[in-house]
């Protein structure tokens, strides 16, 4: 791979991108959600394990199902967002490794020997995929509002009962209302966050 993105693209993905709390009344099509996933799925994960599982909450009924799990500060903005993505991770992701990692038919055994190790792997790589999700959304012209203020057990019971999937975080997506943004917060400098050794 060669070449690099220009400043306009980098602004869209990072420098000008914000966490949105207010939303315009503009729908997000199912086709756009499919396109979003079809971008994010190419991001790297350990042994291509791809543990992320996503539920796109769009309907009024589904939003009402989600509402009891939300913290007070996240309720209004989530109800107003065109889509709320429940980003989950499958703790038994390894069952799909014969399909996803055909280079080595024993790859499933790298993870299924320990529930703790499998869940750590699923959470770590599912979190990576959650970041890819937001970058893919921004690249398609959508804004994001990731959240961790919710009751995990309530979300799991309402949306993942009877499965091996657990919620990681929630992410509202749509077209953000810039008038609802806070002033941008600072970030750590390179010197504060990094070392070259």
From Swiss-Prot:
Signal peptide: none annotated. It comes from the Bacteria. InterPro entries: Nitroreductase, Nitroreductase-like, Nitroreductase_HadB/RutE, RutE-like. It is an enzyme of class 1 (oxidoreductase). Keywords: Flavoprotein, FMN, NAD, NADP, Oxidoreductase. Pfam families: Nitroreductase. Its cofactor is FMN. The keyword Glycoprotein does not apply. Its EC number is 1.-.-.-. Belongs to the nitroreductase family. HadB/RutE subfamily. This is Putative NADH dehydrogenase/NAD(P)H nitroreductase Plav_3612. It comes from Parvibaculum lavamentivorans (strain DS-1 / DSM 13023 / NCIMB 13966).
């Amino acid at each position: 791979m060669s070449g690099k993105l220009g400043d306009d693209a980098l602004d869209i993905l990072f420098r000008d991108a914000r966490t949105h709390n207010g939303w315009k009344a503009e729908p997000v099509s199912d086709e756009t959600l499919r396109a979003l996933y079809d971008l994010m799925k190419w991001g790297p994960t350990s042994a291509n394990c791809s543990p992320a599982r996503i539920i796109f909450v769009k309907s009024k009924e589904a939003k009402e199902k989600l509402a009891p799990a939300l913290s007070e500060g996240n309720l209004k903005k989530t109800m107003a967002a065109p889509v709320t993505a429940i980003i989950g991770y499958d703790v038994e992701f390894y069952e799909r490794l014969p399909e996803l990692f055909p280079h080595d038919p024993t790859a499933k055994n790298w993870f299924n020997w320990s529930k703790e190790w499998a869940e750590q792997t699923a959470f770590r790589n599912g979190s990576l995929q959650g970041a890819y999700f937001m970058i893919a959304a921004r690249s398609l012209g959508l804004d994001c509002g990731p959240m961790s203020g919710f009751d995990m057990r309530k979300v799991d019971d309402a949306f993942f009962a009877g499965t091996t999937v657990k919620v990681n975080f929630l992410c509202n997506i749509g077209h953000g209302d810039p008038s609802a943004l806070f002033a941008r917060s600072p970030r750590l400098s390179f010197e504060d966050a990094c070392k070259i050794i």
